[in-house]
Amino acid sequence: MRIAVLGGGAWGTTLADLAAAQDHQVRVWSRSGALALGEVLAQAEAVFSCLPMAAVAGVIDQVIALGLPAGVIVVNATKGLDRRTARPASSLWQARFADHPLVVLSGPNLAAEIRAGLPAATVVASADGQAAGRIQQCLASERFRVYTSADWRGVELGGVLKNVIAIAAGVSDGLGLGANAKAALITRGLAEMIRVGTHWGGLAETFYGLSGLGDLLTTCNSPLSRNYQVGFGLGKGQSLEAVLERLEGTAEGVATAAILAEYAQRSALEVPITDQICAVLGGLRPPTEALAALMTRRLREEDGG
């Protein structure tokens, strides 16, 4: 299979390596790379979008200008929300390439661990089962297990929404709040993800799988996670600017928190953890006050959402 990977960051190069290891022909495009976008797209049978969310719309415009032949599979591996529409990256691709098969790839996939040869699993989801199956076969190996799903909305939203909860988990660890508090935070974070995800058309059960709970557990517990690193630094009293300056790559949860909080307010959608993390990121509330605000919310019966 001839594959074009858009984005030369850690995740893009990792996916390129996984596909190349299965004897597929892979070309990678990045803004600083040697290959032009047209060269990378030429004769591609699948295009993997591994771009930072902020770059997606602009690159789509470039791909439109160059043209993409019918039948080319578009694979979205970006985990973020668009500032203008408050929609995930796949929605941008779908709007401009409605006649192309769309596949979403998401799961508990820390690029550094995969590059080190450690085992991992992921999900490729699509309304087009044949397209999902082709991408599954393209990437699967003895160290990278790939599942398919028809719930592409739920699979993508799990990866997007968990970034905000990972920041919260990092704050909790930075403050030294202990295992009890972190367990409560992750559990209620999952409930918040399900509430938002089902509002946007995902299936609740999808969030208990690899792309939801699996990705959530990984990013909330690993210092390799950029979103966790942001939260941990804030919990230690560092400024957001200082944390981001040291960060390698993009912590999508920072932008996602602000976009989601604004959307939720307009839509009367309850997102208490996101609201508090947004306040901390914006310097409106110190982490200890955000914790107190969560702990003193109205008492209620536990539910899954």
UniProtKB/Swiss-Prot annotation:
Q: Please name the pathway.
A: Membrane lipid metabolism; glycerophospholipid metabolism
Catalytic activity of the protein: sn-glycerol 3-phosphate + NAD(+) = dihydroxyacetone phosphate + NADH + H(+); sn-glycerol 3-phosphate + NADP(+) = dihydroxyacetone phosphate + NADPH + H(+)
For this chain, one GO molecular function annotation is: NAD binding
Supply the source organism's classification: Bacteria, Bacillati, Cyanobacteriota, Cyanophyceae, Gloeobacterales
Q: Which gene encodes it?
A: gpsA
- What name is this protein filed under? Glycerol-3-phosphate dehydrogenase [NAD(P)+]
The catalytic activity of this protein is classed by the Enzyme Commission as 1.1.1.94
Entry annotation: catalytic residues:
162
Q: Where in the cell is it found?
A: Cytoplasm
